[in-house]
Amino acid sequence: MGNSKSGALSKEILEELQLNTKFTEEELSAWYQSFLKECPSGRITRQEFESIYSKFFPDSDPKAYAQHVFRSFDANSDGTLDFKEYVIALHMTTAGKPTQKLEWAFSLYDVDGNGTISKNEVLEIVMAIFKMIKPEDVKLLPDDENTPEKRAEKIWAFFGKKEDDKLTEEEFIEGTLANKEILRLIQFEPQKVKERIKEKKQ
């Protein structure tokens, strides 16, 4: 997508990313340098993305979640992300606008990409989220959501869906915007992600 491999980020991409994210020119330029160090080709594979993501969460297992995040941002399904896709992924998972984040969250939960979400897909993502929560934090969760199965059940019940029903993107976004409890249940705590990213930038 027009990324320069010479070590400088093209003006067009820099301006576009500043427009679409909250990141500053300095942050983006610094990230681009470290991105090129990790990925000299200017593209990042799923394995490389998992490796970078795991550095944000050294005391948990984010591999499964990172795979789903990667899938949701690999727009052309070529198995790689360029710098622009990578930064948008970071932005959307931490600081995007509510509706943008929910559109992304829908694509995250729509594991097979068929345009609807099933209860099994909810469970698959929730299981990936649970691998990122420290065991001592899991113990602090309420009894009706302290396992992936219970949390998936609770999410599905909030949407008023039967076992084999499907959830459309519109239902997902409207239901989540109308109920903060659903929003809390469907995501890994974004504040923790933000804190980890800030630590890495320092």
From Swiss-Prot:
What is this entry's stated membrane topology? Lipid-anchor
Q: Which UniProt keywords apply?
A: Calcium, Cell projection, Disulfide bond, Lipoprotein, Membrane, Metal-binding, Myristate, Oxidation, Redox-active center, Repeat, Sensory transduction, Vision
UniProt PTM? The N-terminal glycine is linked to one of four different types of acyl groups. The most abundant is myristoleate (14:1), but 14:0, 14:2, and 12:0 acyl residues are also present. The Ca(2+) induced exposure of the myristoyl group, known as the calcium-myristoyl switch, promotes RCVRN binding to the photoreceptor cell membranes only when intracellular Ca(2+) concentration is high.
Residue ranges that the Swiss-Prot or TrEMBL entry lists as coiled coil:
none
Q: Where does Ca(2+) 2 bind?
A: 110, 112, 114, 116, 121
Q: What happens when the gene is disrupted?
A: Knockout mice exhibit reduced scotopic vision acuity, however do not show rod photoreceptor degeneration. Rod photoreceptors have a higher visual response threshold resulting in a 4-fold enhancement in sensitivity to low light intensity, with no change in pupil size. Dark adapted rod photoreceptors have a reduced recovery time following stimulus, a reduced adaption time to background light and sustained photoreceptor signaling response following stimulus. Rod photoreceptors have an increased sensitivity to stimulus in saturating background conditions.
Q: Could you say which tissues express the protein in this record?
A: Expressed in rod photoreceptors in the retina (at protein level).
Gene Ontology biological process terms from the UniProt entry: phototransduction; regulation of calcium ion transport; visual perception
Q: Name one GO cellular component term.
A: photoreceptor outer segment
The answer to whether UniProt assigns keyword rRNA-binding to this entry is no
Q: Name one GO molecular function term.
A: calcium ion binding
User: What does this gene product do?
Assistant: Acts as a calcium sensor and regulates phototransduction of cone and rod photoreceptor cells. Modulates light sensitivity of cone photoreceptor in dark and dim conditions. In response to high Ca(2+) levels induced by low light levels, prolongs RHO/rhodopsin activation in rod photoreceptor cells by binding to and inhibiting GRK1-mediated phosphorylation of RHO/rhodopsin. Plays a role in scotopic vision/enhances vision in dim light by enhancing signal transfer between rod photoreceptors and rod bipolar cells.
**Subunit note:** Homodimer; disulfide-linked. Homodimerization is caused by prolonged intense illumination. May form a complex composed of RHO, GRK1 and RCVRN in a Ca(2+)-dependent manner; RCVRN prevents the interaction between GRK1 and RHO. Interacts (via C-terminus) with GRK1 (via N-terminus); the interaction is Ca(2+)-dependent.
Q: What is this protein called?
A: Recoverin
What is the species of this protein? Mus musculus (Mouse)
Q: State which gene encodes it.
A: Rcvrn
